[in-house]
Amino acid sequence: MSKNLYMEKIGKKSKLASLNLSNLNINKKNSVLKKFNQYLKINEKLILSANKKDVSNAQTKKISDSMIDRLKLNSKKIVQIRNSIDKIIKFKDPTGKTLSAWKRPNGLIIKKVSIPIGVIGVIYESRPNVTSDVSALCFKSGNV
């Protein structure tokens, strides 16, 4: 499968997922984020093992030492990631808020309301904590 076809396939699936996610209430979103956090705790050894493979592959590909250092995970970093998710869980729901409202001379009331964007793409390198932070923030705001 070509890269373009692969990206198109991911894009279509992401758009479909965004439509489903945009309808979740804050309690369900927080419940899913709590389960994600528990998953990280329960599967820490598996995650660290997979990270060692990532680091080894990066070393084989002669990736810079500074980038490899950023790629490395340990138990302390897993705790930091989990703490970050806990903070995101405590954020208020950013969707459905009236940002401004006004009444037109003809009586029509117009409201500017926050809604999910839908699909968000993020480009970054070599930082596993960014993956979890971006995922949790996007999920909390109803985006994928």
Which role fits each region the language model picked out?
Residues 1-110, 137:
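N-terminal Rossmann-like NAD(P)+-binding subdomain of aldehyde/semialdehyde dehydrogenases
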Residues 101-144:
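Substrate-binding/gating loop at the entrance of the active-site cleft, primarily
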